[in-house]
Amino acid sequence: MAMMLGKPGADGLDEAVAALREWQDDRAPVQLHPGDLGWYRRFGAAATAAAVRTWSRDGRTLAVGLLDGPGLLRLAIAPDARRDAELARRLAEDVTGPEHGVLSAGKARVDAPADALLHDLLAEAGWDTDEPWTPLRRDLAQPVEDPGVRIEVAGPRQATVRAAVQRAAFDGSTFTEGNWHAMAAGAPYADARCLIAYGDGGDAVAGVTVWSAGPGRPGLLEPMGVHREHRGRGYGKAVTVAAAAALRQLGSSSAMVCTPSSNTGAVATYASAGFRRLPEIRDRYRDEKRG
């Protein structure tokens, strides 16, 4: 049977999430996580469905993609299909041809597992490598230390506070209480937690959302941020440690995060919270002239 490119629709998102869960492995390269779809769900079910693409053969999903922002496709590929020549050729055709409905003409980026054959084909087509990102992972086999600050699990009643911390942590963020409820209504959030860290004065100083992919699989921190008025006091480390503890309670084998290598402060914060740096990864990109 031929390789099929699909748009799952709102009713098919659960199947895409299930595939992403199955493919998460501590021994494998970092790739799109169900938590990435969960975080995107803040825009609503319809918007998330419109941003997802799947590639399947003989009824089996082999790759899942998320159009995560203008001109960016983030991919996860089944472990036994990352060097599959037929899949790689079809992926390359679909991401390089605007008529296929994946990426528009012009500047574009593809984030794919580092060992995927797709990288070779895109390189042959003239796609270069972009700025490096640093993945970090913390093993959760052993109990996690106390974070040293008060941590609260945010539910519907704390959605306003969680949203306010998000906006105060990220310049340009428009995250609202409504976005939180939209995110929490998605299937991935059944295995997720939002945490809020509080300072000595009782102010909400940092926030993080953690996403489990199921017992024995790596969990994801996305996003983590510290209120701009409370930086430099160790709250980033504290809420990251709390995030690792929450994922361990959810049964995750490890806690994972990825940040631009140029963001040395974030890399240092995660390292201080017991996360180990992994080899840098790079997106493939096409500039506008090649579009």
Task: Please describe what each predicted stretch is.
Residues 19-34, 164-177:
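Helix-loop element at the rim of GNAT/NAT acetyltransferase active sites that forms part
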